[in-house]
């Protein structure tokens, strides 16, 4: 009973601390369509990264290259024009750098054929995702 009480108290304290945490990330104000596009791209990057990890587990470097290529600059160019003037330069640079990373992962998977090398590249690239998510939050502009 004492353990349960301690657990409940710790849970309440933890929740209280989290509720008071201030979100000091930069707010990016975009239209609902733009927000949907950005979030869709992020989900595509996440599912593509999972596909790369599955291929790496099988040591299928051809599949690694194919999945990485799909996340490269070709994917970025589809959205660049509609978002370029709306989003901060630093945000866009992080995104472009991540897409360039995937092109490099694809190239190296084809030429080097080393799953550990690819894992190191993927880990480094995911650091950009972390920086972005720690720095920005996306909000929809309110219609008048």
What are these regions (language model features)?
Residues 10-17:
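Hydrophobic h-region of N-terminal signal peptides that target proteins for export
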């Amino acid at each position: 009973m004492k353990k349960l009480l301690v657990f409940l108290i710790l849970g309440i304290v933890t929740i209280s601390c989290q509720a008071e945490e201030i979100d000091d990330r930069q707010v990016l104000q975009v239209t609902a369509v733009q927000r949907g596009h950005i979030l869709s791209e992020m989900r595509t990057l996440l599912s593509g990264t999972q596909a790369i990890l599955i291929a790496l587990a099988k040591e299928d470097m051809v599949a690694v290259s194919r999945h990485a290529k799909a996340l490269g600059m070709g994917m970025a160019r589809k959205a660049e024009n509609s978002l370029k003037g709306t989003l901060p330069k630093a945000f866009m640079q992080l995104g472009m750098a991540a897409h360039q990373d995937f092109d490099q992962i694809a190239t190296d998977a084809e030429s080097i054929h080393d799953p550990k090398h690819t894992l190191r590249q993927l880990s480094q690239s995911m650091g950009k995702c972390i920086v972005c998510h720690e720095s920005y939050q996306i909000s929809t502009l309110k219609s008048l």
